[in-house]
């Protein structure tokens, strides 16, 4: 099934997904919210700013500037903006989207002002539009270079999830489906916070024992919050949570882990953000998760500790001592 797809968001991840759709045989148009970035992609037929390893776009992928005037050409819209821009993108789409068009989101995080799930934002603004989330352990560079990758498509509408699954899947990119859109979102968002935590620990040279403990206890924290928000327990041992958590906490391709690494090595917040020189979703998500956990009375020691380092100038070494000397408990 050949489709025409609009991709809003031309960072590394949006571009990698646009490439995957083009490799799959679809006609794809990609748009950046920065006019000069669009002009560069149109002129050079690549996105060297975010994916320098891809010399030229395939013939089915092109940049587009005025997507609003051409909205009727597209069957589906893929939103791949940072979480900070998600709500405004959906609000703009409301003015142009047609009844037969539906949305796929590749954005991970929570709404920055209300701390709502992004699916809740989309459903509130576009209540009759089908919505699916694509998430899981996937670095953009590897997907763009057609290395084997497996992800999850989550939607309340299983038929739409299967449609999106078929849209993307080929011999290099395998999509599974789930109707647990809450669990898939919570896992994909909170793991970015814990990747910062893992980076801090690595920067302080705490070793692999600490790394393993952090991932395991971090997974328990994600699960506690997810269950409180209405997720299914089994989702958290799948690709959208455990898979993504393992990947993002363990490899420096992750901007969140690199950011934490710089903090652990002694940089200030601003120095570390400047060094990463790209969006660090976990920095913003930490505030959302902290407030959600407090609202729902969910204990998340690692997330709270990371929040204190990021927003209350707590010393990481003092935080580690506090974590290790907390009241002793049963694991479960």
UniProtKB/Swiss-Prot annotation:
Pathway in which this enzyme or protein is active: Membrane lipid metabolism; glycerophospholipid metabolism
Similarity-based family: Belongs to the NAD-dependent glycerol-3-phosphate dehydrogenase family.
One MF annotation (Gene Ontology) recorded for this entry: glycerol-3-phosphate dehydrogenase [NAD(P)+] activity
Record keyword NADP present: yes
Superkingdom of origin: Bacteria
GO cellular component labels: cytosol
Protein's name according to its UniProt entry: Glycerol-3-phosphate dehydrogenase [NAD(P)+]
Reactions this protein catalyses: sn-glycerol 3-phosphate + NAD(+) = dihydroxyacetone phosphate + NADH + H(+); sn-glycerol 3-phosphate + NADP(+) = dihydroxyacetone phosphate + NADPH + H(+)
């Amino acid at each position: 099934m050949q489709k025409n797809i609009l991709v809003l968001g031309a960072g590394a991840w949006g571009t990698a997904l646009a490439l995957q759709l083009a490799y799959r045989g679809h006609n794809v148009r990609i748009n950046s919210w920065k006019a000069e970035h669009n002009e560069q992609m149109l002129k050079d037929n690549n996105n060297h700013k975010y994916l320098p390893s891809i010399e030229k776009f395939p013939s089915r992928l092109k940049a587009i500037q005025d997507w609003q005037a051409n909205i009727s050409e597209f069957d589906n819209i893929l939103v791949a903006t940072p979480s900070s821009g998600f709500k405004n993108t959906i609000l703009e789409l409301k003015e142009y989207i047609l009844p037969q068009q539906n949305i796929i989101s590749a954005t991970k995080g929570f709404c920055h002002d209300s701390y709502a799930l992004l699916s809740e934002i989309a459903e509130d603004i576009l209540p009759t539009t089908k919505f699916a989330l694509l998430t899981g352990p996937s670095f953009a560079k590897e997907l763009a270079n057609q290395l084997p990758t497996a992800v999850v498509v989550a939607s309340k509408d299983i038929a739409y999830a299967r449609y999106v699954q078929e849209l993307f899947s080929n011999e290099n990119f395998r999509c599974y489906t789930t109707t647990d859109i809450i669990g898939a979102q919570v896992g994909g968002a909170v793991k970015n916070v814990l990747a910062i935590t893992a980076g801090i620990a690595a920067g302080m040279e705490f070793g692999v024992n600490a790394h393993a403990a952090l991932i395991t206890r971090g997974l328990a924290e994600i699960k506690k919050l997810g269950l409180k928000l209405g997720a299914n327990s089994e989702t958290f041992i799948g690709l959208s949570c455990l898979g993504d958590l393992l990947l993002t906490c363990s490899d420096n391709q992750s901007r969140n882990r690199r950011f934490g690494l710089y903090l652990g090595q002694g940089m200030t917040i601003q120095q570390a953000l400047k060094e990463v020189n790209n969006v660090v979703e976990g920095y913003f998500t930490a505030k959302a998760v902290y407030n959600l956990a407090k609202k729902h009375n969910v204990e998340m020691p690692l997330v709270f500790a990371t929040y204190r380092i990021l927003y209350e100038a707590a010393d990481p070494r003092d935080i580690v001592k506090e974590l290790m000397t907390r009241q002793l408990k049963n694991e479960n």
